[in-house]
Amino acid sequence: MEKAGSTDFHVKKFDPVMVAPSLPSPKATVQLSVVDSLTICRGIFNTLLVFNAPDNISADPVKIIREALSKVLVYYFPLAGRLRSKEIGELEVECTGDGALFVEAMVEDTISVLRDLDDLNPSFQQLVFWHPLDTAIEDLHLVIVQVTRFTCGGIAVGVTLPHSVCDGRGAAQFVTALAEMARGEVKPSLEPIWNRELLNPEDPLHLQLNQFDSICPPPMLEELGQASFVINVDTIEYMKQCVMEECNEFCSSFEVVAALVWIARTKALQIPHTENVKLLFAMDLRKLFNPPLPNGYYGNAIGTAYAMDNVQDLLNGSLLRAIMIIKKAKADLKDNYSRSRVVTNPYSLDVNKKSDNILALSDWRRLGFYEADFGWGGPLNVSSLQRLENGLPMFSTFLYLLPAKNKSDGIKLLLSCMPPTTLKSFKIVMEAMIEKYVSKV
């Protein structure tokens, strides 16, 4: 378990400015898909990318990225507009051409203060721009970019996008395009495609999409912590081989790690054995539609898979059993979406809506953020920043799967909002489960 130990710092922000597309953009109202309009997609992406200083010491990263933002909005012109609510609760985008919000900032310290983005450090909150919680949806900027300079020349780029206009892959596509324009490219290498009607159902009356109610936050009775845990690639591969020998079918790294985490977290939290626990995880559905969604589509094209089990059965069962439950959840979602229309079964949470009983896994390993190169190499680190209230995340059930510092090293798990004693128990359970397989060597 890696101990978080980041340093507090202060960010000086200059007045925000609006950055309009560098060329006139179409004035129109474009529709969002039914998936974009889901309540679960009303959140905000806050992505932070950390970079070393540019090799060219005369380069001004603030100016470069501000100009790149103006250029990329020509191709992503809907993002220069505003969201609008329709009568039936769905959303649309009014392409106003107003532009994106751009913030320049600076820190009187070196980039080393960001060496550990796994920490719940309130200082990190200053590295992105936050709308007030009561901001009307019509007043949200669809793109906000904050560039923060450090005394060593390193920079942090914070990008904020509403989930309603893109999913994780779509957000990474936009950031990559922004980086390409910063490098001097004439246009993005991947043409952005809006076409949200591709995900609308043939029969709106038949539309029943997976949604889940808000999850009750944990009672703040004790200090909560956040930590990371790396599972090396050799361990993952060996466990995969062991499991595949048992079931005679392919198992992915995600399935093995997700099952491992689900069991270990459930045991560490000491959830009553009579209760149910649920594992939620998003799946990219772009290739499952008929025809598949085109490359460059940056709207929400994800579905949420749900794996549920009784606590006693999960803890008494094998790793393979948990993997098979996860496989079934994936298969069920694929079956529902492998048609030309968006249709799934209605869903309700049968887990008492307690945050401990629900774990949402978010896999960031292949979204594309780590490939963003603004002209001075790839990012040192990438992080999804959650809004903190009173020093704690507003959403406490997410666990992120990230590449380790060196991608070939394995998978990094980022756990948050768990008491330090529980984090310690989680580590012990994880190591014991891994040792059970590795000791067979």
Swiss-Prot record:
Enzyme Commission identifier(s): 2.3.1.321
Q: Does the keyword Transferase apply?
A: yes
Q: Which domain of life is it from?
A: Eukaryota
Function noted in UniProt: Catalyzes the stereoselective coupling of the surrogate substrate N-debenzoyl-(3'RS)-2'-deoxytaxol with benzoyl-CoA to form predominantly one 3'-epimer of 2'-deoxytaxol. This enzymatic reaction constitutes the final acylation in the taxol biosynthetic pathway.
Biological process annotations from GO: paclitaxel biosynthetic process
pH profile of the protein: Optimum pH is 8.0.
Pathway(s) annotated for this protein in UniProt:
Alkaloid biosynthesis; taxol biosynthesis
In terms of Gene3D superfamilies, this protein maps to: Chloramphenicol acetyltransferase-like domain
Q: Which terms are listed as keywords in the entry?
A: Acyltransferase, Taxol biosynthesis, Transferase
Which PANTHER family does this one have?
ACYL TRANSFERASE 4, N-HYDROXYCINNAMOYL_BENZOYLTRANSFERASE, PUTATIVE-RELATED
Q: Which reaction does it catalyse?
A: 3'-N-debenzoyltaxol + benzoyl-CoA = paclitaxel + CoA + H(+)
Q: What is this protein called?
A: 3'-N-debenzoyl-2'-deoxytaxol N-benzoyltransferase
Gene Ontology molecular function: 3'-N-debenzoyl-2'-deoxytaxol N-benzoyltransferase activity
Name the active site residues: H163, D373
Instruction: Name the family the entry cites.
Output: Belongs to the plant acyltransferase family.
Q: Which organism is it from?
A: Taxus canadensis (Canadian yew)
